[in-house]
Amino acid sequence: MKYILHRKGYQVLKAYDGMQALKMLETETVHLLILDVMMPRLDGIRATLKIRETNSIPIIILSAKSEDADKILGLNIGADDYMTKPFNPLELVARVKSQLRRYTQLGGNVSSTQETIYEVGGLRINDDLKEVTVDGEMVRLTPIEYNILLLLMKNQGRVFSINQIYESIWNEDAIGADNTVAVHIRHIREKIEINPKEPRYLKVVWGVGYKIEKL
């Protein structure tokens, strides 16, 4: 894995266990993490939970477990992507490239003097600064969560199906997309809604998809 990423031009730092990965994140400039579920000392699940307390860096989890429940768990704890072993190394490279592109866009420099802002009620996205606020309070979103919310905010009132959301954000065919999108939608609601079970902004249209409600 390290070899193929090097061949594709990426600089790779290797940690031998989860604790070393956390220390490396504090001392090195890291733009993406690939964590194995079975890492010693601190496994990939617990490492992801710890990282998500303070950092929105893209995380790809690797696991030999292919069941939907394991994938949902990985996404539930804040991972941006989940791959089951064995996998094609070129697919990993493609996913790394995709996650880094989103992360770079999310943290990109502002060059325009006119801000691009989308608002509904107390929910506000400044797409130049890549900032999300609710009633003036800053909200921390992962790159995937931000891009989903931005897609819906740009098209307030329009219903997007799960497949449309997946294909727009992941840029790949929506195979098995239901659980993946649903988990990220739930995370967004937990961060922007006062009561996620009775959302004001991010609504579901049963049997169709999701939308940002016009207020």
Language-model regions, residue ranges each:
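Charged docking surfaces used in two-component/phosphorelay signaling
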Residues: 2-7
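DNA-binding patch around the recognition helix
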Residues: 115, 140, 185, 189-215
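Short, Lys/Arg-enriched segments at the junction into DNA-binding effector domains
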Residues: 98-159, 163
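Short hydrophobic/Thr-rich beta-strand motif most characteristic of the beta2 strand and flanking loop
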Residues: 9-16, 24
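Receiver (REC) domain active-site loop signature in two-component systems and cognate sites
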Residues: 39
